[in-house]
């Protein structure tokens, strides 16, 4: 795929000297990927959308070309039946150091208008950026991460002097609809240390995040005439659902939660004839708080059963959606980032994310926890979205140094 004409014209006007050779390479790759409409579908996540498969095929072709040009034996890439792209580059050292995994995602959000995406190259505060014409999203989330990962693969394959352990890459579908790890092959992708290229603010690395559960309770009512309700054992599902919601202390609600505090959030009710289902979000960082919330949920159900004996109660959903990566994070992951950042003169801020990441979804499926690295994206999930090439290059440099640091681990 070639540059869109308008992007080429603006790029030529800016001049290649406006950015480094690395940025030039990443710009070409990013614009190619951004021009592919790879929105995921929340209602029909599987099989993956045609645009995501197009992205997967474009990535595989690029990696195959890089492998063919290199002298690296044993490097492989494949697309799974479910649309995941896996890349493996074997270690080029004899040391038994940990394997390193890098993840990102193929899809872009369905929450904003996609379709005929027209990437435009521009400048902002002296940096080269890529934006849209304001009528569609750009897909910087996470085509910035994809571009950085592909550039890292090219560099490692073309520079055998860079010593490294086994490297594993996963380009995942359906992240923006919360399904990135649903069909991941943990036999193919199961690194000892994981980093996710999907962050926004420059220099920020997410070291922990919410654990997220979906907890849905159905209240099955029993109809009767109100005038004879007691004799006919009237079961009021609406009243029971209201009592269930009211059981949770106001202090446990999201509007009273900050920092590393979690919350219980009954956020939606659905009604089907006599039955009412309460849909609840449960979020926490610390396992001890999660155990407290478990007791609160069980207590709420027991209380409603006692107060409304004619209403049957069913827990219809109790799913772990994503997990705090800190639970299983490699003990030297933070040191790796700090050492790598120091070598390139970068100031890093470690944060606790009140949300989830691709790595958090993977952790919920049994993989080791992974930090999330900034990737040069801004104003994501909107038609104001843009990508900053200098910040993408900075993320690339940080990850390359992390790769070089791995052999020092035992």
Regions found by a protein language model. Give the residues of each.
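Sec-dependent signal peptide recognition
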Residues: 1-7
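Active-site-adjacent substrate-binding region
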Residues: 239-256, 263-265, 312, 320-374
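Acidic/His- and Gly-rich active-site-bordering loop/insert found
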Residues: 19-129
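Midchain, well-structured core segments that form catalytic/ion-binding scaffolds
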Residues: 121, 125-136, 174-295, 299-302, ...
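Active-site metal-coordination/substrate-binding segment of hydrolases
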Residues: 94-162, 166, 171, 394
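Zn-dependent metallopeptidase/amidohydrolase metal-coordination segment
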Residues: 34, 272-274, 347-401, 406
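Flexible, glycine/charged-enriched surface loops at secondary-structure junctions
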Residues: 70-78, 161-166, 250-265, 304-317, ...
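Hydrophobic h-region of N-terminal signal peptides that target proteins for export
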Residues: 9-17
